[in-house]
Amino acid sequence: MSCAEVMYHPQPYGAPQYLPNPVAAATCPTACYHPAPQPGQQKKLAVYSKMQDSLEVTLPSKQEEEEEEEEDEEEEEKDQPAEMEYLNSRCVLFTYFQGDIGSVVDEHFSRALGQANTLHPESAISKSKMGLTPLWRDSSALSSQRSNFPTSFWTSSYQPPPAPCLGGVHPDFQVTAPHGTFTTADPNSWPGHGLHQTGPAPPPTASESWHYPLASQVSPSYSHMHDMYLRHHHPHAHVHHRHHHHHHPTAGSALDPAYGHLLMPSVRAARIPAPQCDITKTDLTTVTTATSAWAGAFHGTVDIVPSVGFDTGLQHQDKSKESTWY
């Protein structure tokens, strides 16, 4: 062994740790005795050994450093936008894509559609079948409904039945008027009602149907009452028709001449025009004779006011007329 080789022996604290080999010491006179280092020195030695190990690591060459720098620059260039557009003070548009956008989009969609058809052909067929099933169901439903309609419904000669306009409102409502509800009677046969009518009454419609008989059909005495009312009050119509009753004609002039033979003598006398100077006299005589005649004719049917009271009322009325006339 050479003199540089030494043997390490673990020793207690304070004892020398490095002892020279006796054989080496005998052969090498330069070998000397060194005392063992302290614990602080041991730590320093450990740190020193680590520093040497780190220095022994091979450092990168200059070429490698340059390559790394170039790669970093390329990455930075990729991260930078290809186009920058200033929109406003708070918005700037950066465009990172380079190339033709339209061609890239077309290529993307064509590739996606091709993959969908090639990878999932069974799913596409099942979807098409699922889309057709509602049509089959609808066609079957239409065929079942078609069997419910008559054959003429599906041809051009089909005519729909008339819709009930009024019959569908209520089951008890009759669309057509029952037979015998209205009778087309001659309007001249109604006393007093034919005075202002120029033509026959219009035929009744379905909406104006009335299920109750007219008053003339219920009580036969209605016509007698109406005639009596006309012949009591209308003889004075020619006296004051110039004042406020100008739209009411006189009874004698408005009656049909066909009924002249049915009138009583007092009414016939009223039809003859009298001079203006004898108006009050003719009115008084006509009223008194008419009241006495009508009282005798309809004593059993209608109760009439006594002629005395009626005449006194008419005389009072005639006096008031005379005062305004003259």
Swiss-Prot record:
Name this polypeptide is given: Transcription cofactor vestigial-like protein 3
Organism (species): Mus musculus
Localization in the cell: Nucleus
Physiological role: May act as a specific coactivator for the mammalian TEFs.
Pfam families the record matches: Vg_Tdu
Similarity field: Belongs to the vestigial family.
Principal subcellular localization: nucleus
Gene Ontology CC annotation, any one: nucleus
InterPro entries: TDU_repeat (IPR006627), Vg_fam (IPR011520)
Biased segments, Acidic residues type: 64-78
Annotated GO biological process: regulation of DNA-templated transcription
Annotated crosslink Glycyl lysine isopeptide (Lys-Gly) (interchain with G-Cter in SUMO2) location: K62, K129
Matching PANTHER family: TRANSCRIPTION COFACTOR VESTIGIAL-LIKE PROTEIN, TRANSCRIPTION COFACTOR VESTIGIAL-LIKE PROTEIN 3
